[in-house]
Amino acid sequence: MGTTVTSRNIFYNVPARRKFLKSDKIEFKHLINEFVRLSLSHHEIEFTLKHNNKPIYNLKRANQKKRVVEVLGKSIEKKIIPIEEKTDLVKIRGFVFKAEYLNKSRNNQFLYINNRYIKSNYLNHAISKSYDGLVDKEIKPSYILFLECDPEKIDI
C-alpha cells in the first residue's frame, strides 16, 4: 500500500473557513474533479476514491488510454483519437474527441504541462482555433493533452 489521504471535518475548529464551504454535494464534486485530473496524468499509479466508505473509483495501473476510459467512462473509448507529435521544443501526446462528439461544454478539457494540470485561456484558445471551420463557433473542443517540455523554458 502506498499513500493514503483522508479528509474529515477539515474546518471543524475554524468556523471562519467553514462558512466558505458549499454543500457537501458540491464540495465532493470539487474533490472528484481534482481526483480525475490527478489520476488522468498518472496512469502508472493505482488510485482509490471512497466516499462514506463506498468505493467511487478503484483504478489500477494501466496504459494512458485505458486510464482515460476508466475515469471518463466506457463510452469515451469510441469518441477519442490518440495523438502524438514531437518537435525540438515540445512533445504533445494525448487524445482529442471526434468532432461529432463535441458540444458546448468545456467539461472534457484536460491540459497538462509536464504532467501538471493547468488552466490556460491562451492555450485553450489556440486549441479551439484548430477547430475553426470544422465545427460551429459555440462548440467547444474536448481533449486530454499532455505537453512535455524543458521546465527551464516555462513558468507555470
Residue positions per predicted region:
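N-terminal phosphate-binding caps/lids of nucleotide- and nucleic-acid-binding domains
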Residues: 1-155
